[in-house]
Amino acid sequence: MKFTTVFFDIDYCLLDTPTSERRIIKELYAQQGQIVDDAVGDQYRQINKELWVYLDRGEITREQLYVMRFTRLFAIHPFFKPAEEVAPWFLDQLARAHDAQAGAEHLLQRLRGSGVRIFTASNGVGSVMNGRVEMAGLSKYLTECFAADEIGAMKPSHQYFDYIFKHSGETDLSKTLMVGDNPVTDVNGAVDYGMVGALFGARWQEPSKATFVAKTMKELENILFGKE
């Protein structure tokens, strides 16, 4: 195991966010007596993904994103409440969602047992993200959790990665790994700073500067520790 410090993104990485989002979308439409399938949740996720690109570029604010994703979804699947009213409800539900990614706890346990220091590094709201990780039973493996609102910068900025690296206590960038699902904000941002990048999942098709690519936690474990 060559890495001594590993940073993990939270949504779509340590947490199985798609499962949570599909469930919440079903609960939302149940409020108007409508049963929807996973396809509606998947449409929401695609809309959300597209809007996050604009947010990462600084073209919209986080608050605008929260409302716009439902404005667009309701244009396809009408809902009896306005997007402005649904947005805070959805955030509250998501803050309670804590579906762990399959194999995440096992990998964290193995990394921790190997003496690796483990951190989370997200572009989300710290209090919300940390609470979800704790409810998922993963916080006991973590050294510290970093979030954009507490740092005052977002991935992929140099300021963000400079902060988490310096506050991690690590001194060797070549022994520092960033694992995330976003090829631009997670992987390319980390690699441009000097870390090693690992792209997790299959949500994005864009090219990245990742040294490692894994679709599952088991694949990532095999990459880091070698196949048993």
What spans do the regions from the language model cover?
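Asp-based, Mg2+/Mn2+-dependent phosphohydrolase catalytic module
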Residues: 1-6, 109-112, 119, 124-228
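N-terminal helical cap/lid subdomain that shapes the substrate entry/recognition surface
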Residues: 2-102
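Conserved strand-to-helix beginnings and helix N-cap segments that scaffold or border functional pockets
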Residues: 18-22, 101, 105, 130-132, ...
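A short, Lys/Arg-enriched amphipathic alpha-helix followed by its capping loop at the start of a domain
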Residues: 28, 107-114
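A generic structural signal for short
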Residues: 58, 95-96, 117-118, 174-175
